[in-house]
């Protein structure tokens, strides 16, 4: 059996404040929560019983996706903070634009280098030049915010991280466009869940320039 307790401090501007109940006055405590996991998340309404949090991820598909997605050229901005320590293995996807086979365009913290990566995948393989790693950023550490922007069209791909760690590449063969049907936020659809907080996702139905990518992520 595991035993837990909650310690509550009442503090004012000058330090601790004492409080003694008198049978009528009191204090209200809201949102005290125990969680399994390596880091705390947001409040889970439990209504007096144990609750299990599902994976916090979103998918945009169907007409909701096709109404805004430009299959010829696109750009995406993502801002997020990971919580998993760099010494822990695992790929953490902040977003993925693709299909049910995970083909497409994904941005994640890579499990080996711990750097932010932009990965292009087609027919379950990586085309030549399909891994863009802005290694100048270094490890994406737990608690560190990364501002990542990518731009892509056939033959022209780029990624910028925090305003200057930029990599461009040319991927002219096996470019995944025709089968892209969804956008996942916080995973690549079948796993690689992003363990952290995503502050912003923005989509642009055009190819932004390198300077524009750097400005967005600065």
List each model region and its residues.
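Residues that flank catalytic or metal-binding motifs in active/ligand-binding sites
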Residues: 23-30, 74, 103, 144, ...
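Short, flexible beta-strand-to-coil junctions
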Residues: 11-13, 97-102, 153-154, 187-190
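Extracellular glycan-recognition modules
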Residues: 58-118, 203-214
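Extracellular glycan-interaction patches encoded by glycine-rich segments
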Residues: 10-24, 178-203
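Acidic glycine-/aspartate-rich tracts in secreted/extracellular proteins
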Residues: 13-14, 35-41, 82-86, 124, ...
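Extracellular glycan-interaction surfaces
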Residues: 1-18, 27, 31, 109-174
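A general structural signal for short secondary-structure junctions and capping/turn motifs
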Residues: 21-25, 65-70, 175
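Extended recognition patches within non-cytosolic domains
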Residues: 35-68, 166, 199-218
């Amino acid at each position: 059996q595991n035993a837990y307790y909650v310690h509550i401090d009442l503090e004012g501007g000058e330090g601790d404040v004492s409080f003694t109940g008198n049978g009528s006055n009191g204090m209200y405590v809201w949102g005290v929560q125990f969680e399994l996991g390596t880091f705390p998340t947001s409040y889970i309404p439990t209504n007096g019983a144990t609750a299990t949090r599902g994976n916090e991820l979103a998918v945009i598909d169907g007409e909701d996706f096709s109404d805004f997605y430009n299959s010829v050229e696109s750009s995406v901005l993502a801002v997020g903070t990971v919580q998993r320590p760099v010494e822990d293995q695992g790929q953490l996807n902040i977003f993925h634009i693709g299909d049910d086979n995970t083909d497409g365009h994904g941005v994640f913290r890579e499990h080996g280098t711990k750097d932010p990566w932009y990965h292009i995948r087609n027919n379950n393989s990586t085309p030549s030049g399909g891994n863009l790693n802005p290694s100048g950023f270094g490890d994406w550490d737990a608690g560190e915010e990364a501002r990542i922007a990518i731009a892509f069209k056939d033959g022209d791909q780029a990624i910028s991280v925090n305003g200057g760690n930029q990599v461009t590449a040319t991927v002219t063969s096996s470019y995944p466009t025709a089968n892209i049907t969804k956008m996942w936020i916080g995973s690549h659809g079948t796993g690689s869940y992003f363990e952290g907080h995503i502050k912003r996702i923005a989509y642009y139905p055009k190819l932004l320039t390198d300077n524009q990518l750097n400005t967005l992520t600065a």
